[in-house]
């Protein structure tokens, strides 16, 4: 698997280019020889589908064709020594044409102002934001087999593109393993005497790998969006909201452990990284929290580590504790050696008192604490804290109240009941609104809530939506 990943990274015209053209060419040619054309092509399709997840199948497929063609030509015995450099340069030039058939990216025009190796490296760094709302829907068994029998290769290509573009944040080895097993299942079952029985049996055997791949995509998407430190605080917020009766000492090690797992596994070349790390993490979850919360205790009775992890991951926030209001960290807290500890303590204490979803808290806490920390570097830090703390406290309170209003009634009701209550609230708030306008308002608000008012809401999408909804609060 590691050898496969070397190939895929080289195909992206990335790190190998910095080591020299001969090094890059030798790597790619060795991998083509080892894998053969079809596996080389399939793996290229997976890579570019996940890299350019917003592109069409035709755009990705065209790029793959170009890459495979130039690799075949330039790795052939007796090929011109300059072939690889010439063809990759031609590809980067073609990518800059207005009618280029390749994936479109807003950063392409800037790359096209550069020349030679600099342009190739710039192009290699381009990628689309991950798909935070996967749209892939598996066809029925009959539809699968009909498409497979009609065009086995076309079916495989379309599946690799759709699955990889939807779940592209899953670690690459997992993505490769799952798609390979899935296509093997289709090939076996669509040619068997009893496809239905075959599919049931095969899917049961693949269940763990399927869950591991989709769950890894979820958690790695957030990690990619937030980065390591913000991911750590995000997991701390979620755990504090799920188990507000726990202590910081119970939840902080779990947040840090999970963040370390993601930092190791999301870009790992090992297929076993997530498979071995997550079970160990679930043991720690159960050791730390099963006695602190009845829902965690129930989750820890599940029969597999993956089921335990999923149970705890999707667990909603508990009712926040009714505790005295918490004060913002002071200069003494933030300007000494225990800055991180003070911020963790404040994040934990605020989260266990607050029902607003994590995406809201993560968004408002970062600038709030950053502004306070900056007071430490001013000439008169005491005066800075005295001025900034009351202002930041008002902004923080206003932001949280607005977030609670936007997500009111969502988590404790069915979606239908929520929409009824939402309509009543909006009707009371805007009594002169026409029925058609009210309907539009309900649809807009409920769409936002369905995407951004749960504990695992996607950060990139929701951050921009919160900006749009709360612009006055954010600027005040």
UniProtKB/Swiss-Prot annotation:
GO terms for molecular function: actin binding; calcidiol binding; vitamin transmembrane transporter activity. This is Vitamin D-binding protein. Disulfide bonds join 29-75, 74-83, 96-112, 111-122, 145-190, 189-198, 220-266, 265-273, 286-300, 299-311, 335-376, 375-384, 407-453, 452-462. PROSITE patterns: ALBUMIN_1, ALBUMIN_2. The lineage of its organism: Eukaryota, Metazoa, Chordata, Craniata, Vertebrata. The gene is Gc. CDD domains: ALBUMIN. Belongs to the ALB/AFP/VDB family. InterPro entries: ALB/AFP/VDB, Serum_albumin-like, Serum_albumin_CS, Serum_albumin_N, VitD-bd, VitD-bind_III. Residues 17-208, 209-394, 395-476 form the Albumin domain. Glycans are attached at residue 288. The modification Phosphoserine is found at residue 434.
């Amino acid at each position: 698997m590691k050898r496969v990943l070397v190939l895929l990274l080289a195909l992206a015209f990335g790190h190998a280019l910095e080591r020299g053209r001969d090094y890059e060419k030798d790597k790619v040619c060795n991998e083509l020889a080892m894998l053969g054309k079809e596996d080389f092509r399939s793996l290229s399709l997976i890579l570019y589908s996940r890299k350019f997840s917003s592109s069409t199948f035709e755009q990705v497929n065209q790029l793959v064709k170009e890459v495979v063609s130039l690799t075949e030509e330039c790795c052939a015995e007796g090929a011109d020594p300059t072939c690889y450099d010439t063809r990759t340069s031609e590809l980067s030039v073609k990518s800059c044409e207005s009618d280029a058939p390749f994936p479109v990216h807003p950063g392409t025009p800037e790359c096209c102002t550069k020349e030679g190796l600099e342009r190739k490296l710039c192009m290699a760094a381009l990628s689309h934001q991950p798909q935070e709302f996967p749209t892939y829907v598996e066809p029925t068994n009959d539809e699968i087999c009909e498409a497979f029998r009609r065009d086995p290769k076309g079916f495989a290509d379309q599946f690799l593109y759709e699955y990889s573009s939807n779940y592209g944040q899953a670690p690459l080895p997992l993505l490769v393993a799952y798609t390979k097993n899935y296509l093997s299942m289709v090939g076996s079952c669509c040619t068997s005497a009893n496809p239905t029985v075959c599919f049931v049996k095969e899917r049961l055997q693949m269940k763990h790998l399927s869950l591991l791949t989709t769950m890894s995509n979820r958690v790695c998407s957030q990690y990619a969006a937030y980065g390591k430190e913000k991911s750590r605080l995000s997991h701390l917020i979620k755990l504090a909201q799920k188990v507000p009766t726990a202590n910081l000492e119970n939840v902080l090690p779990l947040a840090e452990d999970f963040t370390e797992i993601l930092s190791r596994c999301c870009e790992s070349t090992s297929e076993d990284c997530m498979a071995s790390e997550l079970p160990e993490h679930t043991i720690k979850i159960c050791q730390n929290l099963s006695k602190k919360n009845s829902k965690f205790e129930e989750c820890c009775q599940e029969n597999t580590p993956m089921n335990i992890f999923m149970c705890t991951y999707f667990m909603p926030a508990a009712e926040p504790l009714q505790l005295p209001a918490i004060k913002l960290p002071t200069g003494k807290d933030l300007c000494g050696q225990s800055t991180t500890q003070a911020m963790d303590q404040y994040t934990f204490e605020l989260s266990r008192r607050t029902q607003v979803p994590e995406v809201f808290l993560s968004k408002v806490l970062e600038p709030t604490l950053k502004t306070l920390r900056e007071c430490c570097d001013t000439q008169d830090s005491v005066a800075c804290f005295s001025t900034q703390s009351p202002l930041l406290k008002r902004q923080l309170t206003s932001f949280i109240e607005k977030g609670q209003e936007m997500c009111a009634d969502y988590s404790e009701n069915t979606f239908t009941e929520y929409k009824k209550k939402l309509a009543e609230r909006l009707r009371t708030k805007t009594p002169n609104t026409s029925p058609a306008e009210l309907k539009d308002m309900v649809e807009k608000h409920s769409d936002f809530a369905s995407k951004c008012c749960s504990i695992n809401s996607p950060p990139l999408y929701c951050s921009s939506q919160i900006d749009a909804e709360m612009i006055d609060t954010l600027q005040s």
